[in-house]
Amino acid sequence: MANIETILKLAEEKILLVHNLKDLQEYKVEFLGKNGIVTSELKKLSSLVNGQERKEFGLKINTLKDKIHNIIKAKVQILEEEELNLKLAADKIDLTIPARRYKQGSIHPITQCMDELIQVFAQFGFTIENGPNIENDFHNFTALNFEYDHPARQMHDTFYLKGRENDKPLLLRTHTSTVQIRAMKNGKPPFRFIAPGRTYRSDSDMTHTPMFHQIEGLVIDKNINMGHLKYVIIKFIRSFFENPNIELRFRPSFFPFTEPSAEVDIRMNKNDKWLEVLGCGMVHPNVLKNVGIDRSEYQGFAFGLGVERFAMLKYNIKDLRRFFEGDIRWLKHYNFESFDIPNLAGGLTK
């Protein structure tokens, strides 16, 4: 009995002085482990002949074991609380320290320009249509009245991909006119929408990049004529540049998908040079035929513009390639604040 009380007192003294969980675990093994002090006492049962003595001794050993276990358990709780308090003290936040400056992102000039262009067309009742970047030869060329030997179909102008769709070559769309074809095939006239998005051509210099952004517009209805086209283009240009005095001229041109076709030039002031900004024309009858629209009942006009071109003119950016270089200094100079998004109520932005 005296030996059991001595073991309990020794355990209490040692565990009381422990300051970390690692040392506590070592004492647990020392007293309750396979070769520990309490286990060694328990082995003495085999030397006792009297059954009653064995029973009483076994009960005392088990009681000792439970007491030491409870002491260790209580110490574990104390040490864990101490560790948590130390961690909280080390991690506490000083509310008097000035906060780090919040870094807010900004709007890329192409995104800003795209938003402004869309808002202008929204004033004229245009909706938005979207389509895939990967197209087949039919939607990108054939349905738009491109001849099979047209230079635009060549590898040096178009990015062709491996694989085919409905036995037609796959490619990265070279214009968003593909969206017009899909929309006309899947819907019924009248139509009045724009198709903004990325386009791809094998070209790279100061005025061309392999990937660029376009907005193409389409209007299909009864009794549509060139006068409607000119009205929309003139109103659009003057609204976007916020200059009612911009001069415009329509030059005869050629596009496979429009007839007659024109290119539009502008100049801000009388002494400025004329600058080409977009192409347009009346939708070619073959295009209407290819999408199942009655050419004798419906007519329409289409136009297409490069978003980068309009951004360069409006924001006075000289080199097209700078849009895609990721130069932080350049982006900080030409960026737009997130609250500087155009809206119909507040008008256009800088």
From Swiss-Prot:
Binds 2 magnesium ions per tetramer. Keywords: Aminoacyl-tRNA synthetase, ATP-binding, Cytoplasm, Ligase, Magnesium, Metal-binding, Nucleotide-binding, Protein biosynthesis. One of its GO terms (cellular component) is cytoplasm. InterPro entries: aa-tRNA-synth_II, aa-tRNA-synth_II/BPL/LPL, Phe-tRNA-synth_IIc_asu, Phe-tRNA_ligase_II_N, Phe_tRNA_ligase_alpha1_bac, Phenylalanyl-tRNA_Synthase, tRNA-bd_arm. It holds the Pfam family Phe_tRNA-synt_N. Its cofactor is Mg(2+). Mg(2+) binds at E259. GO terms for biological process: phenylalanyl-tRNA aminoacylation. Its EC number is 6.1.1.20. It catalyses: tRNA(Phe) + L-phenylalanine + ATP = L-phenylalanyl-tRNA(Phe) + AMP + diphosphate + H(+). It is an enzyme of class 6 (ligase). The keyword Protein biosynthesis applies. It is found in: Cytoplasm. One of its GO terms (molecular function) is magnesium ion binding. Belongs to the class-II aminoacyl-tRNA synthetase family. Phe-tRNA synthetase alpha subunit type 1 subfamily. Tetramer of two alpha and two beta subunits. HAMAP family: Phe_tRNA_synth_alpha1 (MF_00281). This is Phenylalanine--tRNA ligase alpha subunit. It comes from Rickettsia typhi (strain ATCC VR-144 / Wilmington). The lineage of its organism: Bacteria, Pseudomonadati, Pseudomonadota, Alphaproteobacteria, Rickettsiales.
